[in-house]
């Protein structure tokens, strides 16, 4: 089975164009439906502390984008849900699987969030299955995203437990070092893992990690993802929560993994690292550029909406796309 499976990553794939049927790229519809809601783009800023905070979450929700709030301000989650609902905005939070999280979930019955993401590094676990069942029993209307996983077996088990979507990606992210520290993961074959998992899935797949260019979003959708979670491309903006650092007159923003010692506050079971990214412009400008690039992708696919990307052919061109090019 494994030996027969094609193994490739984003840089190994080129999508093949179809005849364009729209007069302008602006006619292409990049919206996507997840649960009972429609969002402007199939992208999610990673639920990491240097990517998203409450201010960014509120702005994304107000502007029609999906978001997932990180889980590292545990006491602030319930007030956050309340504030979002007071503004008629969707609430989307993250939980772990520790014992106290069960009481927290039960406490949300009176003001349940629209989305909960169970967010742990190795999501194919009895602890995750147990938490999915608990959330579904306590908050049956809440859309549950579970992860992270990297195999069809994991997707099926989490879906069977009640997950409404699964997040695929073990260690392909820019600040994740799981594959180096443990020898396990989808780093280097993340796109093939998305394809593999999507073929087994009956519910939405969220591709998480390894996205380095806007074209990778289109490739993720081609191989079965409904949404794409992105870290590094969303890090380093003026609004980003990461700490600003100045070196030789140039400003940088910190970006670190959720399993890094900087996140944990201790050097224990570290599977993440910290990097500095040159400060970018505003987040809204990046989202606009992503939309425009995705509209171009749809036009090359010969369609009018994201679904057309799933029907294009592709070629595997091992490590030759870049050919010395850079953006």
Curated annotation (Swiss-Prot):
SMART domains: IMPDH
InterPro entries per record: Aldolase_TIM, GMP_reductase, GuaC_type_2, IMP_DH/GMP_Rdtase_CS, IMP_DH_GMPRt
E.C. number(s) listed in UniProt: 1.7.1.7
Active site: 176 (thioimidate intermediate)
Cited PROSITE patterns: IMP_DH_GMP_RED
TM annotation in the entry: none
Keywords: NADP, Oxidoreductase
Catalyzed reactions: IMP + NH4(+) + NADP(+) = GMP + NADPH + 2 H(+)
Gene3D superfamilies: Aldolase class I
Annotated GO MF terms: GMP reductase activity
Binding site for NADP(+): 205-228
GO CC terms: cytosol; GMP reductase complex
GO terms, biological process: purine nucleotide metabolic process
EC class name: oxidoreductase
Domain of life from the UniProt record: Bacteria
SUPFAM superfamilies hit by this protein: Inosine monophosphate dehydrogenase (IMPDH) (SSF51412)
Pfam families referenced in this protein's UniProt entry, alphabetically: IMPDH
Record-linked CDD domains: IMPDH
Function: Catalyzes the irreversible NADPH-dependent deamination of GMP to IMP. It functions in the conversion of nucleobase, nucleoside and nucleotide derivatives of G to A nucleotides, and in maintaining the intracellular balance of A and G nucleotides.
Family indicated by similarity: Belongs to the IMPDH/GMPR family. GuaC type 2 subfamily.
Identification of the protein by name: GMP reductase
Organism: Streptococcus equi subsp. zooepidemicus (strain H70)
């Amino acid at each position: 089975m494994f030996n027969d499976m094609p193994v490739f990553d984003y840089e190994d794939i080129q999508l093949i164009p179809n005849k364009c049927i729209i007069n302008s790229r602006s006619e292409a519809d990049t919206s996507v439906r997840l649960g009972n809601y429609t969002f402007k783009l199939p992208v999610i800023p990673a639920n990491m502390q240097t990517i998203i905070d409450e201010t960014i979450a509120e702005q994304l929700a107000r502007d029609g984008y999906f978001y997932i709030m990180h889980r590292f301000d545990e006491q602030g989650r319930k007030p956050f849900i309340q504030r979002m609902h007071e503004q008629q905005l969707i609430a989307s939070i993250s939980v772990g699987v520790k014992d106290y999280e069960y009481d927290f979930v039960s406490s949300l019955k009176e003001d349940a969030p629209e989305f909960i993401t169970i967010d742990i590094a190795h999501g194919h676990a009895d602890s995750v299955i147990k938490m999915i069942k608990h959330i579904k029993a306590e908050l049956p209307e809440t859309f549950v995203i579970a992860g992270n996983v990297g195999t069809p077996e994991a997707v099926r088990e989490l879906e069977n437990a009640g997950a409404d979507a699964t997040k695929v990606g073990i260690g392909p992210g820019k600040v994740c070092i799981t594959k180096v520290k443990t020898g396990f993961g989808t780093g280097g074959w993340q796109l093939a893992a998305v394809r593999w998992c999507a073929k087994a899935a009956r519910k939405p797949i969220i591709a998480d990690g390894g996205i380095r260019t806007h074209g990778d979003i289109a490739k993720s959708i081609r191989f079965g993802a409904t949404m794409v979670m992105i870290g590094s491309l969303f890090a380093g903006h003026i609004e980003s929560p990461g700490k600003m650092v100045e070196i030789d007159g140039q400003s940088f923003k910190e970006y670190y993994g959720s399993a890094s010692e900087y996140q944990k506050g201790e050097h224990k079971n570290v599977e993440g690292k910290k990097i500095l990214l040159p400060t970018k412009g505003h987040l809204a400008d990046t989202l606009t550029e992503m939309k425009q690039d995705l509209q171009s992708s749809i036009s090359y696919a010969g369609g009018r909406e994201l679904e057309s990307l799933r029907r294009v052919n592709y070629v595997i061109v091992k490590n030759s796309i870049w050919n010395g090019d850079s953006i």
